[in-house]
């Protein structure tokens, strides 16, 4: 049992869990550091436990848990850095509220929980062959080849990047809600200085980020789709043509309804 725990800590998720627990401990142990609310720090320990418990789940779902763990660190850490005055006011104004970090922990817990459901396992059994494969990167596609040494690792990193981009988009949408509140408050109070500040120094950066994130998200998702379908096509052809499978099918008891035409 002890050996299993040590082995779990040596995995990528295990190392990430240790770093997350250390970050949460730092926020609690050093009162001189401007820290987020107590529940945000405690959520870090919960995140560490979720990361360790996720070692045995699907390779596809591990990506989600890992990204949410990184999201917690970024959100909690950025609010702490902003509280220390190390970020420009314009950047600090764009940050979501502190409780957004706990949202990442909740989503990670949901992913861990649903990973044990049979319908979800049926889906991940279809997705995992691509994300767990160790084949060399597809030569025909140059996009994101530097993301890993195997096609499976590239796929996992692209999924992680896509989730992170969507996570940023949700945080940006939340920040837009606070912008609407502040700018309408300035209109109600006839505060011209606050109005122009919100319009020029908050809305313009938010709108620019929103457009950039939307375009980048489309680029990442399209790249993942192309790479995944290319690998699936190669895998299907290899299984169909390898070891004379297509010759031996007529001599088995299994019925095949024009598989060659379906592949085409």
Predicted regions and their residues:
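Short cytosolic helices in intracellular loops of multi-pass membrane proteins
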Residues: 229-248
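Membrane-integrated ABC transporters
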Residues: 1-203, 217-221, 225, 247-264
């Amino acid at each position: 049992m002890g050996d299993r725990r040590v082995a779990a800590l040596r995995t990528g998720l295990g190392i990430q869990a240790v770093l997350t627990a250390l970050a949460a401990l730092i926020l609690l142990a050093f009162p001189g550091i401007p820290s987020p609310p107590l529940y945000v720090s405690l959520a870090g320990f919960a995140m560490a436990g979720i990361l360790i418990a996720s070692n045995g789940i699907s390779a596809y779902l591990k990506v989600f848990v890992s990204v949410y763990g990184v999201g917690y660190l970024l959100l909690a850490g950025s609010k702490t850095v902003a509280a220390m005055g190390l970020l420009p006011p314009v950047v600090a104004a764009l940050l979501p509220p502190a409780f957004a970090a706990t949202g990442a922990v909740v989503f990670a817990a949901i992913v861990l929980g649903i990973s044990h459901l049979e319908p979800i396992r049926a889906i991940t059994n279809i997705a995992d062959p691509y994300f767990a494969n160790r084949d060399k990167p597809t030569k025909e596609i140059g996009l994101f080849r530097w993301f890993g040494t195997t096609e499976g690792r590239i796929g996992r990193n692209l999924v992680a990047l896509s989730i992170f981009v969507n996570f940023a988009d949700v945080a940006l949408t939340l920040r837009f809600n606070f912008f609407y509140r502040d700018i309408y408050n300035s209109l109600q109070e006839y505060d011209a200085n606050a109005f122009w500040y919100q319009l020029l120094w908050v809305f313009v950066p938010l709108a620019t980020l929103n457009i950039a994130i939307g375009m980048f998200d489309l680029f990442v998702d399209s790249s993942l789709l192309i790479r995944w379908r290319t690998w699936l096509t190669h895998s299907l052809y290899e299984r169909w043509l390898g070891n004379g499978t297509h010759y031996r099918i007529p001599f088995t008891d299994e019925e095949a309804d024009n598989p060659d035409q379906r592949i085409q």
